[in-house]
Amino acid sequence: MKTALVLILATATLAVAYPSSTQDYRVVADKTFLTRQRDFLRLLVRIEQPNYYADQYEVGNAYDIEANINNYKYPHVVKNFLSAYKRGMLPRGVPYSPYYTTQSYETKLLFDLFYYANDYDTFYKTVCWARDRINEGQFLYAFSTAVFQREDLSDYILPPPYEIYPYLFVDSEVIQKAYETRMSDVHLTAPKTYIFPVNYTVANPEQELYYWYEDVGLNTYYAYYYFNYPTFFNETEYGVHFDRRGELFYYTRQQLYARQFLERHSHDLGEVEPVHYDRPFQTEYYPRLRYSNGQEVPPRPYEYSRRSLYYSNGNSYYYGNYYGGNNNYYTGNYYTGNYHPSYYYGYSTEHDYYYPEDLQIYDRRVLDSIDYGYVFSYPDHKYPLYEDYTKGIDYLGDVIEGNGDTVNRRYYGSIYHFYRQLAGKNVDPYNDSGFAPSALQNIYTALRDPANFHILKHINSYFQRYKGYLPRYTYDELVFPGVKIENVDVGKLVTYFDYFDVDIDNVVNVKVAEDGKYVDYRARQTRLNHKPFTYNIEVNSEQATDVYVRVFLGPKYDYLGREYDLNDRRHYFVELDRFPYKVQAGKTTITRNSRESSVVSHDYPSFRTLLRKVFDAYEGKEQFYYDKSERYCGYPERLLLPKGKTGGQTYTFYVMVTPYVKQDDHDFEPYNYKSFSYCGVGANHKFPDDKPFGYPFDRVLYSQEFVTPNMYFKDVVIYHKKYEEINAATVQQ
């Protein structure tokens, strides 16, 4: 899925230096590809049930991992996994969280088994074996990450997670209706479609944003980010390099927060307060989700939202992930080198103990490092934050995320994840009630909880403190001599709500594969969309040159109607696009469509559609094409614009043209880098951009000295219309 490292380029006759964004990179799938694609899809059908495809079941049943130890790159990977498996891992049917230490450790062991399989045949037999023996949540996480990371699997398509495991994406009331319908239609003999509307009740202002928080595409983007950049991945162990990984962590979180801010802005809501370990938590949350075993995703009622991360009597607390039996004990050193769990995670207990005092200590250490100018490693080595800004923010981002490349996990912890863990267990801090993992403790649901954005605001404050110490960009650094933007023309910007059907067939059990063909259950959700728009940029240049075009959208007025100072609103500008272009001497008009954005991905093909097309192609009924330029990871194209207003809402459309500085001999070859802005460029590739992410809004600025001829600010108005109005206008056209 990572082959599609492509950068969307402007379509104009003058842009001959780069591939066209309309170029067709589709490839006709051969029999080998179709066989493997079909097998991947079948593996993911009703993953909480035993596999009812007999051939895959037999492959898994007959396979002996230990007897095939030489078919894996490293024998110790097999030994480590089997040692944990024989000792006892998370049982099937138990809710899973990749942020519980023990469960995360087990998932890494399983991923390593998949990742280090020497060839496809070994990989396939291993996943068939694991499909019915490993917890379904762990299996899905490890399998998906392996497909994203293995070079030999890069072209294969995974169905969207909201259709593999709908429980964490669709209202539990709808799931219940699907159960009841299935019970009344046990003996289906022909296909029958049922559509279950997802209804929302807005009980407080925060819930007005339900359509954004609960957008299945947005939450899929967040999950795919972690499949692209697994938290446990590190360069030393896996021998791969993630270019600007720490900076990308910062930028994606900053942009998510800014996009949520713009969505709040469209509802005249103010900015959220940052979370803090010793202050009351303000946001209640009722997820209306439940796991496949029937356990509810825990809510956070108002009375618990009002208390701080300290326990109500002022004492500290921990949370645990104990799930019974002997599964919670890990005493052996299953990692090699420094990657024993107690070393990597900083805790050596079978429970995950997190004290608010720990957060206070980690918080102080990060702030001290920013102020001092160094992050500290083992035993006495230190890495400078301000000598090379690109490396400095990378070090800082790795430290705050606490990923596998952090210079010192023991010393700095993982502030981002620790805050989510503590806030997520706020209702049941001692784990007395045995609650399932909360929304904040799962990659598929974290963005649904508004609390995540309180945490993001706090996380962003570290980076803003760091950026505040960097020198402001000077006029000479910002200007592009000989290049001027003379005008920007933006088409009409219109948002609307439409309807989207999520295939929820996988929530109901069937006995044989044939029965599954007749089950067609769909949850119909309301989602935000916008009409595609085009903008034209008129550039005048003294000579032909390669340029980089950067496009942002930001608020012009605050929620009280007061015009922002540019420096005050720079944090809220969201990136709409970033692309190279070759301008000619004299005047060049750059035309760009919103669907070409390097930020976004488009709707994913549904599970049902993929199954039908692949099976038909496998049987010779039609051809199946896969797109080598498609990444399937990116911000949803539908959400590129914040919701408008009936009478319109004014925003600032900002364009900047900078010199294009080639970073790698393979920049933009052979494809475009689709959705690289928010999903990176994957392992062992360089970002095709020499500027900091978010440039030029990433540093403090003086409004009077900021504007240069190669920039252009344009007031635009975003309107919101009813779906019927959009349809009527389309028919008239």
Curated annotation (Swiss-Prot):
The entry describes its oligomerization and partners as: Homohexamer.
InterPro entries tied to this protein: Di-copper_centre_dom_sf (IPR008922), Hemocyanin/hexamerin (IPR013788), Hemocyanin/hexamerin_mid_dom (IPR000896), Hemocyanin_C (IPR005203), Hemocyanin_C_sf (IPR037020), Hemocyanin_N (IPR005204), Hemocyanin_N_sf (IPR036697), Ig_E-set (IPR014756)
This entry's Gene Ontology molecular function terms read: nutrient reservoir activity
GO CC terms for this protein? extracellular region
* PANTHER family reported in the protein's UniProt record: FAT-BODY PROTEIN 1-RELATED (PTHR11511:SF5), LARVAL STORAGE PROTEIN/PHENOLOXIDASE (PTHR11511)
Q: Which UniProt keywords apply?
A: Glycoprotein, Secreted, Signal, Storage protein
State what this protein does: Larval storage protein (LSP) which may serve as a store of amino acids for synthesis of adult proteins.
Give start-end of the signal peptide.
1-17
**Which family does the entry's similarity section mention?**
Belongs to the hemocyanin family.
Which superkingdom, per the lineage?
Answer: Eukaryota
What Pfam families does this protein's entry cite?
Hemocyanin_C, Hemocyanin_M, Hemocyanin_N
Q: What is its main location?
A: secreted
Name of the protein in question: Hexamerin
Spell out the subcellular localization from the entry.
Secreted, Extracellular space
Q: What positions does the record give for glycosylation?
A: 199, 234, 431
